[in-house]
Amino acid sequence: MRTHFCGLVDETLIGQTVTLAGWTDVARNQGGVCFIDLRDHEGIVQVTVEVDNAEVFAVAASLGYEDVLQVEGVVRARHAVNDKMRTGKVEVIATAITVLNKAAPLPFHAHENPGEETRLKYRYLDLRRPEMQRMQRTRIKLVQALRRHLDEKGFQDIETPILTKATPEGARDFLVPARMHPGEFYALPQSPQLFKQILMVAGFDRYYQIARCFRDEALRADRQLEFTQLDMEFAFVRERDVQDFVEDMIRAIFKEVVDVQLDASFPRMTWAEAMRRYGSDKPDLRIALELVDVAELVKDSEFPVFTGPANDAEGRVAALRIPGGASLSRKQIDEYAAHAAKYGAKGLAYIKIADNGEISSPIQKFFSEASFAALVAHVGAGNGDIVFFGAGGYNKVSDFMGALRLKAGKDFGLVADGWAPLWVTDFPMFEWDEEEQRYVALHHPFTAPAVDDIADLRANARTAVSRGYDMVLNGNEIGGGSIRIHRPDMQSAVFELLGIGAEEARAKFGFLLDALNYGAPPHGGIAFGIDRIAALMAGTESIRDVIPFPKTTGAQDLMTDAPSPIVDAQLAEVHIQVRPKTN
């Protein structure tokens, strides 16, 4: 139906007859001549229809937005070059136009940017927009480049099951009723974690998969119910073996897909250092602001909000200096306090130093002149700055001060251009869940501890460090991995520390424990979020822009109207009865 793509018609084709097919982007009838911007996935070319070709002119004059056309014509140099178009030096003089399909009146035009609900309801129209085409192509190029790179490095692309066993990995499972086994259910995989470990036991050595994963969790801009990850696993490796390989891979992929040259060597930072300096386990290093601990300077003050945490081994008092922040009004300071409150802050103390050196602070009265001056000097504050203070439990203070750091960086234009990758390592093995009164795994239950001795792990569970690692880019965790537990006795001990008894462990993970018993090699791996990397490459804040058919934050597919009710007959086949929802 066509000989060339619209967006690839150029000067080399001048004088030649071409057949094109695409959509009417714009049609303009200027009396003696009609101009049609014909669009396909490669771009737009101008089609010109002259009035002396009456039959073709009549067709052109009747066209509407998004009508589907086949155009035959001769390529000619344009009198008025359009430098904004790739095809702007040529036009196609139409000799025949066939309308392949008329488009109904549109809910929005390809050049408009309607609300997200409208875009998702008519996703097929939204995806026609050039910007959406660009972002989807970025994703396609990313996946192609990853596959090519891993195939060349000897990795084996192995599929793992979609219908599998429900196992706890931190989020709620999507359950699928098993019709042939009444009352029993499959679960959709949250990740291929256990299968890829078993593939290492099976001797496949280097595995990868572009895997679909499912987690029934609350949605936001960087979360979806179903998502795609590059899953990788290596046998007989230590942390640096995995990190060095994937660092080289990510560097090569960014260069190939978006022509970005990442650092020759990614910096490394322990989890403890990241939390201390940046209040985040995925710090955005493009923002130069850092948290400063001030407990030693405030522990003897008369301000109880500070003295309590400052004299508590598990407390923290931290400061954040914002250059130029003295320009903040009282209302704006209150907005910062409200932002911190979302992350657990109960208040936000501050010191504001005007350009003339005048100090405004609600906490100054609780300090002697000398101790207050020492505090200001310690945080490096000068004229024109504001300093925010957070006090409380160590982790909570780190969280809300880290959130303030990000907000201040954006508000004050302190986010540097470019790319800032790093490795975050040495994560805590466990964290204490106050609600459940037990330890939970910070990464997942299959991450190896840094110690090999089970007695040591049991005795020091609270401070145990894992062999986990995350790759962070511009404040986004793009990949997370670890060295895995390969000894069955260590895996059983970790289950025990997590409050998973022997009977429960056998019921949920018996197949894994059995596999580890039959000669499991030391192994480790990593998983990268394809959606998130594609969004970063495409320059969009929301992963929904790089997913062809995403769900809304309300967990709905507006185009297909999913989820939707199921008729009783279908429910009966899978032995399910829906009970009315009660408040």
From Swiss-Prot:
Domain of life of the native organism: Bacteria
Gene3D superfamilies: Bira Bifunctional Protein, Domain 2, GAD-like domain, Nucleic acid-binding proteins
Location in or out of the cell: Cytoplasm
Tagged with keyword ATP-binding: yes
GO CC field: cytoplasm
Sequence positions that bind L-aspartate: E169, R215, H443, R484
Catalyses which reaction(s): tRNA(Asp) + L-aspartate + ATP = L-aspartyl-tRNA(Asp) + AMP + diphosphate
SUPFAM superfamilies: Class II aaRS and biotin synthetases, GAD domain-like, Nucleic acid-binding proteins
UniProt KW keywords: Aminoacyl-tRNA synthetase, ATP-binding, Cytoplasm, Ligase, Nucleotide-binding, Protein biosynthesis
Main location group: cytoplasm
Aspartate: annotated span: 193-196
GO molecular-function terms, A-Z: aspartate-tRNA ligase activity; ATP binding; nucleic acid binding
Enzyme Commission number(s): 6.1.1.12
Binding-site list for ATP: R215, D216, E217, Q224, E477, G529, I530, D531, R532
InterPro entries hit by this protein: Aa-tRNA-synt_II, aa-tRNA-synth_II, aa-tRNA-synth_II/BPL/LPL, Asp-tRNA-ligase_1, Asp-tRNA-ligase_1_N, Asp/Asn-tRNA-synth_IIb, AspRS_core, GAD-like_sf
Gene Ontology annotations of biological process type: aspartyl-tRNA aminoacylation
NCBIfam families linked to this entry: aspS_bact (TIGR00459), PRK00476.1 (NF001750)
Function summary: Catalyzes the attachment of L-aspartate to tRNA(Asp) in a two-step reaction: L-aspartate is first activated by ATP to form Asp-AMP and then transferred to the acceptor end of tRNA(Asp).
Protein family according to the UniProt entry: Belongs to the class-II aminoacyl-tRNA synthetase family. Type 1 subfamily.
Protein's recorded name: Aspartate--tRNA ligase
